[in-house]
Amino acid sequence: MAEEKALNDQMLARRQKLATIVSDLHLDPFGKRFERTAKAQELHNLYDASSLEELENAKHEVVIAGRMVAKRGAGKVIFADFRDVSGKIQVYARRDDLADNYPIIKRADLGDFLGIKGIMMKTEAGELTVLATELTHLSKALRPMPDKFHGISDVETRYRKRYLDLIANEDSFKKFQERSHIISAIRAYMDRNDFLEVETPILQTEAGGAAARPFITHHNALNIDMYMRIATELYLKRLVVGGMERVYEIGRIFRNEGMDPKHNPEFTTMESYAAYMDFTDVMDETEGIFKAAASVVSDDLKITYQGTEIDLGTKFARKHLVDLIKEQTGIDFWQEMSVEEAQKLADDNHVKYEKYWGVGHIINAFFEEFVEDTLVQPTFVYGHPVEVSPLAKKNTDDPRFTDRFELFIMGSEYANAFTELNDPIDQRARFEAQAAERENGNDEAEGIDEDFIEALEYGMPPTGGLGVGIDRLVMLLTDSDTIRDVVLFPTMRPE
């Protein structure tokens, strides 16, 4: 209660100051357009190397704007720190220089926005500073800033009120800047390689392209239920059928599933499809994307994630899923076996399975149980069973497996790709098998998308497809241990 009263007292004091800005200073407390000549970091880049005497002689005039985050002094002289999107800069305000303008900064609270015109200088201590010659009040903050800018300790507040997190935590602010730059780097890589960026529907009549539970909504005008997309895959492939040989989309995906440190119900992916490529070509593409993204945060492409060094600059390893299982368990799934034999192996090794599973499902479960966590450095794992790859092309040498790969780093999957299934007859059979799984209790199995099958019947060239989880990639590159730290507004339970 005492803390709440103190907050209320501070808010009351700020509202009283708001009134005096109007009554005494005759200013609009919420300002108007303001034109600046430089940002804080630009000033540091230009003048940090200059001496006190050089700046004193040059008298460089600048105009800046930002939020006041620190204030020292209250009489005839005030030092204050102002932050903009690029960083912080100190301002030195003297009553004798500013005259009637001086009350603007004297009455300003932490969090207020001011515009400052001034001359570049350095203090005796060597700190780069703007000597204010004119002040403009731009906006009044009616609530006190969190924790005096020392951060927000309550993680719930950080996620629910991200604006406070961005104000208080410079590391968090920087992380989201890096996220934007990472996405830009991926876009630039795709554009350089002749991929066309496209947009596909978020509202769909069939939920396909992934094994996931969709969000369902209702379209009033059409009086039909629709699904929030769980993948962009099937529409992007339609575009390849239509002659767009290289396409990609960066966009939001929605899955009505659980939340944990690596999963949020809405998340961002990048999917791409390229005609006349196969999954080995897509490995090269994926490696290029990850190297481009890593260059945003590391010049040598080496990063540290949760204390472990990851080298994204080296050639990524390529290993078959069955070989990896054999390395870890001694079990050879290259041998053909019945479902009963696979179930016995699972029972003997304490691997759980569902009653509707085939041999391929059990092989995949062995991989998840015994191999995933061992894959620390970037590794392409290829050759997934047909049963868990309904949209991937069968391997010609062993049709039990597919020309599919996943990229693993630090025991987690970061990309999923395959040589796309372009045989409409085989695709229908796969969809029907998925529908049967749904009947047997797998509520994440896909249904039959008749329109997509029709599109394939018009002919789709051999195609390599890729999906990358952007949020998980940003987690890796910014050393974040939860997806909520890299999604600006994560899904939260209502308070």
Curated annotation (Swiss-Prot):
GO molecular function per UniProt: ATP binding; catalytic activity, acting on a protein; lysine-tRNA ligase activity; magnesium ion binding; transferase activity; tRNA binding
Cited Gene3D superfamilies: Bira Bifunctional Protein, Domain 2 (3.30.930.10), Nucleic acid-binding proteins (2.40.50.140)
Coiled coil: none
Entry keyword Protein biosynthesis: yes
Subcellular location: Cytoplasm
Major place of residence: cytoplasm
SUPFAM superfamilies: Class II aaRS and biotin synthetases, Nucleic acid-binding proteins
Cofactor(s) essential for the protein: Mg(2+)
CDD domains, per the entry: LysRS_core (cd00775), LysRS_N (cd04322)
Catalysed reactions, as listed in the record: tRNA(Lys) + L-lysine + ATP = L-lysyl-tRNA(Lys) + AMP + diphosphate
Residues binding Mg(2+) 2: 413
One GO-annotated biological process of the protein: lysyl-tRNA aminoacylation
Protein name in UniProt: Lysine--tRNA ligase
Species for this entry: Leuconostoc mesenteroides subsp. mesenteroides (strain ATCC 8293 / DSM 20343 / BCRC 11652 / CCM 1803 / JCM 6124 / NCDO 523 / NBRC 100496 / NCIMB 8023 / NCTC 12954 / NRRL B-1118 / 37Y)
Lineage, highest ranks first: Bacteria, Bacillati, Bacillota, Bacilli, Lactobacillales
